[in-house]
Amino acid sequence: MKIITCYKCVPDEQDIAINNADGTLDFSKADSKISQYDLNAIEAACQLKQQLGDAQVVAMSVGGKALTNAKGRKDVLSRGPDELIVVIDDQFEQALPQHTATALAAAAQKSGFDLLICGDGSSDLYAQQVGLLVGEALNIPAINGVSKILSLTDSTLTVERELEDEVETLSIPLPAVIAVSTDINTPQIPSMKAILGAAKKPVQVWSPADIGLNSVPAYSAQQVAAPKQRERQRVVIEGDGEEQIAAFVENLRKII
């Protein structure tokens, strides 16, 4: 059984600065980290490996220069995957979900897999599209919002997903793609032994040409800015007469 778990490198939100003059965001001092939602996907894949015993877990990512960071690669591998595959090119820096999914699908097809696990969304965009788009690109079953994996055999996967007023139990044939929610597990913190052992695990670096892609259209970000801050207003209406009540109602209407 070969399981691929996909992840994305995103800027650490704690290090993103805001320019007070125009509200633009400064990412220059922000280190990259694994998207928080993808930590659940990595943990889910590694838990399946422990249950099955003979499974192989491959971490996979598509992106730009952030994927060249040795510390970031070590962080991923210290969380349990046996191997790492990264597809690196400048055109993936600002790729749309559809283009990211196209590249992941091509890389997964080249690597081979039985099950592909994604996070619910990325910490930066949270488009919640990539997992389903990968399934569409590969023409295989895809389920999002998975909150529990009930069973996995050589041919079938059974999962639960929680909807607003019900819990679905779904069985799909393999190969398949699932996107897991944050309810599925609590990602573990890597031990010192795992961190040291991560340096010995294999890393494959591919280009778009290696997976059969010539170019992927990317959008151009004209500006990224924080919303303007509004001062909190405090309106005090004294009295309980009809005029005061009318004024109170009028102020409520303004904020509803």
Curated annotation (Swiss-Prot):
Question: Which keywords annotate this record?
Answer: Electron transport, Transport
User: Which Pfam family is one of those matched by this entry?
Assistant: ETF
Q: Which Gene3D superfamilies match?
A: HUPs
Annotated GO biological process: carnitine metabolic process
Q: Where are the transmembrane segments?
A: none
Q: List the disulfide bonds.
A: none
- List the pathway annotation: Amine and polyamine metabolism; carnitine metabolism
Q: Which top-rank group of organisms is this from?
A: Bacteria
| GO molecular function terms attached to this record | electron transfer activity
Say which family it is in.
Answer: Belongs to the ETF beta-subunit/FixA family.
Q: What function is annotated for this protein?
A: Required for anaerobic carnitine reduction. May bring reductant to CaiA.
Q: Quaternary arrangement and interactors, per the entry?
A: Heterodimer of FixA and FixB.
Q: HAMAP family attached here?
A: FixA (MF_01055)
Q: What is this protein called?
A: Protein FixA
